Amino acid sequence: MQYPEPISKLIDSFMKLPGIGPKTAVRLAFFVLSMKEDVVLDFAKALVNAKRNLTYCSVCGHITDQDPCYICEDTRRDKSVICVVQDPKDVIAMEKMKEYNGLYHVLHGAISPMDGIGPEDIKIPELLKRLQDDQVTEVILATNPNIEGEATAMYISRLLKPSGIKLSRIAHGLPVGGDLEYADEVTLSKALEGRREM
């Protein structure tokens, strides 16, 4: 079906979002058209505001509106422990359980040779630099329990073994093939408690 150009552009824009196919994009576009103009303008402003005012922390890579982020700036945090995660959403998931008090390092991805993503394409060099500069005694590998997450954890483990830094991996209370962001606080808490040395 041929839509007027403004609707077609809106549909195309929605289809650029992950998990949004043609049918869902059409539904979203027509829903937006049915909304009051002030609500649509607020939505558009929120999108632009987020894009303009959010950045990644220069220390840990978490999403933030200040640099360094509130976690890296918090003097009450245990600076001797770094929890390595794949995405900023994983930091938010870990923080929800309110049990971990160390710092984070966000890799912004995982090693995936099938997708052409190697160790140099994610924030592993930045992690190694942090470990030289900081007084870190433990690294918790909290990458997702899927093939890419496991490969990334094993790669980092091999790199860090000679350093003498204590290495642990969160326990697999998380389902294999799952993502941290979808886990509830109890599951994450048990996974963190049951981490093992590597």
From Swiss-Prot:
Residue ranges occupied by any Toprim domain in the UniProt entry: 80-175
> Which InterPro entries does the annotation name?
DNA_Rcmb_RecR, Rcmb_RecR, Rcmb_RecR_Znf, TOPRIM_dom, TOPRIM_RecR
The record places its C4-type zinc fingers at 57-72
Q: Which SMART domains match?
A: TOPRIM (SM00493)
Q: Which domain of life is it from?
A: Bacteria
One GO MF annotation is:
DNA binding
Q: Which Gene Ontology BP annotations are present?
A: DNA recombination; DNA repair
Give the keywords, sorted.
Answer: DNA damage, DNA recombination, DNA repair, Metal-binding, Zinc, Zinc-finger
**Entry's PROSITE patterns?**
RECR (PS01300), TOPRIM (PS50880)
Q: Give the HAMAP family listed for this entry.
A: RecR (MF_00017)
Similarity comment text for this entry:
Belongs to the RecR family.
For this protein, the record's PANTHER family field holds: RECOMBINATION PROTEIN RECR (PTHR30446:SF0)
Briefly, what is this protein's role? May play a role in DNA repair. It seems to be involved in an RecBC-independent recombinational process of DNA repair. It may act with RecF and RecO.
- Protein's recorded name: Recombination protein RecR
Q: Name the gene.
A: recR
